[in-house]
């Protein structure tokens, strides 16, 4: 999305860059509007030094506001997260909300933030949240601004709980330390979906000039429109969470030891409180990682999904105190990774799909014990995204509840869960393979705090039966059928290459012909959610919503395998997800793993063609 063309202004004196006129205009306008001395000074220096390349990076194109909001590095310019772009974004969002809600000035919005900061540009999540609050308050809109850092799920919880019009969370979740983001929730408590992203985007373009009091963030401290929900929401959230504690007596007596890491993010205090709410002894926190630190000094990437590299300190502490289970939240505590020490002495990090199987089984089992009336099953649902394991489908088929698949991302599951709730249905659980879990539908998004404590209760309960998480997972696969999954990605920074790669798959054996084989593996069905084609449907049209702006093709194979190739919405990656599903009974998991490895090898060789497209494999 190109930046709105500003009014004609002469280039800053002495720029002498001979830059294209638009860049001159953008930088001149920036210097008129930006009141942050660090970012405005850095732009002046780039102009004085004639650093055209860096100026193009900063001013080439405005950050695109999508359904995930914004995510970009912090720094100067319209392509970065900084004071001015936060002001502009919030002004647009405010105007859009005014059009959508006649009672915006009665209901208001909630804003919270994580612990990120970027001293070089003076940007931080806290400051961005205060500037966003200022924009709404100057327009007479009540703002519920948390006084300190919170997990991301507290924002959708507050929207639903206080019946607000919208929520904003300033976070870049598990991205590298230089990034920040702006995540938006609608009045139903779920992340926005189209067409709201386009409407907000347009409103941002129409409201680029800072309003008269935009920079006066001290306004928020004295405004009667400002409310601090920290104490009441914290209290209410943990009261609601207690309803999902099924074995309080077991918890009180549990001898299972847990290690928890918040990976320098916001999770520590909240997970401690969650354990207290469940009457579990508090988990042992990794001391080097428990306090928020925007530098993330002990990890290369603050992403627990990366596995053992992020968990090294957790394993060391667990070995020291003889704990068998590690719980790891990402920095904004909306996701959860779990590892368990095996009898061999090795640590097993569960994949998102494996933990989805365990939590899904547990929440259904616990619900069934409380609801003896089996007629309720027809109104009971679980959800997962289309690239996640189909294990919940297998459990649903055998147990008699409903399973639904959505597009990738919790925005789809949150909105679907809300629709089902409105129809009087019960949504027990939703998950995605990227270690995101919705265990309690009072938050219509992934929540790593509730997932951590529910996982701890599950482990404590299993311990009374002398079972480990790994043993229970195996029992689930024996009962409902083995579901062996794998996922990886290739890095590709060039959009043209990505278009060519997917274009080749759509014209594999001549124009408009998808592949019929992948190496030795026969393809039985193809669904392309970029074009809306699905040859398993009678009319060849896909049932799930399609999006021309992202690439996504799913191949079903004659051997029961399913593989999806898709582009990432937030990173320069082409991802793939593959699964082999076997019917219930004692299948041979080793044989299935071998067959899945062969299938993935064929997909990499024939469909990705990394040499031809110069793709960079995932670093092991």
UniProtKB/Swiss-Prot annotation:
Compartments where located: Cytoplasm, Cytosol
Catalytic activity: alpha-D-ribose 1-phosphate = D-ribose 5-phosphate; 2-deoxy-alpha-D-ribose 1-phosphate = 2-deoxy-D-ribose 5-phosphate; alpha-D-glucose 1-phosphate = alpha-D-glucose 6-phosphate; O-phospho-L-seryl-[protein] + alpha-D-glucose 1-phosphate = alpha-D-glucose 1,6-bisphosphate + L-seryl-[protein]
UniProt xrefs under Pfam families: PGM_PMM_I (PF02878), PGM_PMM_II (PF02879), PGM_PMM_III (PF02880)
Binding site for alpha-D-glucose 1,6-bisphosphate: 71, 173, 334-335, 408, 432, 446
Keyword Metal-binding carried by entry: yes
EC number: 5.4.2.7, 5.4.2.2
Principal subcellular localisation of the protein: cytoplasm
Subunit: Monomer.
Protein name: Phosphopentomutase
């Amino acid at each position: 999305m190109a930046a709105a063309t500003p009014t004609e202004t002469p280039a800053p004196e002495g720029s002498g860059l001979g830059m294209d006129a638009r860049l001159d205009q953008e930088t001149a306008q920036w210097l008129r509007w930006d009141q942050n001395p660090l970012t405005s000074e850095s732009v002046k220096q780039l102009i004085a030094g004639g650093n055209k390349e860096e100026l193009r990076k900063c001013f080439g194109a405005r950050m695109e506001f999508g359904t995930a909001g914004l995510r970009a590095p912090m720094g100067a310019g319209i392509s970065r997260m900084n004071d001015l772009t936060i002001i502009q974004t919030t002004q647009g969002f405010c105007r859009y909300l005014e059009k959508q809600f006649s009672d915006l000035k009665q209901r208001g919005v909630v804003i919270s933030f994580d612990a990120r900061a970027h001293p070089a540009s003076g940007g931080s999540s806290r400051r961005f949240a205060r500037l966003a609050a200022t924009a709404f308050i100057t327009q007479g809109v009540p703002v519920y601004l948390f006084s300190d850092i919170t997990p991301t799920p507290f924002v959708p919880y507050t929207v639903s709980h206080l019946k607000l019009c919208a929520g904003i969370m300033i976070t870049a979740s598990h991205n590298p330390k230089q990034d920040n983001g702006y995540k938006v929730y609608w009045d139903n408590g779920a992340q926005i979906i189209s067409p709201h992203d386009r409407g907000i985007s347009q409103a941002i373009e129409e409201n680029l000039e800072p309003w008269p009091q935009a920079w006066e963030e001290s306004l928020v401290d004295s405004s009667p429109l400002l409310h601090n929900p920290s104490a009441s929401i914290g209290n209410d959230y943990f009261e609601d969470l207690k309803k999902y504690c099924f074995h309080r007596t077991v918890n009180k007596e549990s001898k299972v030891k847990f290690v928890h890491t918040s990976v320098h993010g916001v999770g520590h205090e909240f997970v401690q409180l969650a354990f207290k709410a469940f009457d579990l002894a508090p988990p042992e926190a990794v001391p080097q990682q428990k306090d928020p630190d925007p530098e993330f000094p002990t990890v290369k990437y603050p992403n627990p999904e990366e596995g053992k590299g992020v968990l090294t300190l957790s394993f060391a502490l667990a070995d020291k105190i003889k704990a068998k289970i590690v719980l790891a939240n990402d920095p904004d505590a909306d996701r959860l990774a779990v590892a368990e020490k095996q009898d061999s002495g090795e640590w097993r990090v569960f994949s998102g799909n494996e933990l989805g199987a365990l939590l899904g089984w547990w929440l259904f089992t616990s619900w069934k014990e409380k609801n003896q009336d089996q007629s309720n099953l027809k109104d009971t649902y679980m959800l997962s995204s289309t690239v996640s394991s189909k294990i919940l489908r297998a459990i649903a088929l055998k147990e008699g509840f409903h399973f639904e698949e959505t597009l990738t991302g919790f925005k789809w599951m949150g909105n679907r869960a809300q629709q089902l709730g409105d129809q009087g249905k019960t949504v027990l659980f939703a998950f995605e393979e990227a270690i995101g879990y919705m265990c309690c539908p009072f938050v219509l998004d992934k929540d790593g705090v509730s997932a951590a404590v529910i996982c701890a209760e599950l482990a404590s309960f299993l311990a009374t039966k002398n079972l480990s998480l790994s043993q229970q997972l195996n029992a689930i696969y024996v009962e409902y059928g083995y579901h062996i999954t794998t996922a990886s990605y290739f890095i590709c920074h060039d959009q043209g290459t990505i278009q060519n790669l997917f274009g080749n798959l759509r014209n594999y054996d001549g124009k408009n012909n998808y592949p019929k084989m992948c190496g030795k593996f026969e393809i039985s069905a193809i669904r392309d959610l970029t074009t809306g084609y699905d040859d398993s449907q009678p009319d060849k049209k896909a049932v799930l919503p399609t999006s021309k702006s992202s690439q996504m093709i799913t191949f079903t194979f004659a051997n029961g395998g399913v593989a999806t190739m898709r582009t990432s919405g937030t990173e320069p990656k082409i991802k793939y997800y593959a699964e082999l599903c076997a019917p219930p009974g004692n299948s041979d998991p080793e044989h299935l793993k071998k067959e899945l490895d062969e299938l993935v090898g064929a997909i990499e060789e024939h469909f990705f063609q990394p040499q031809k497209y110069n793709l960079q494999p995932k670093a092991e």
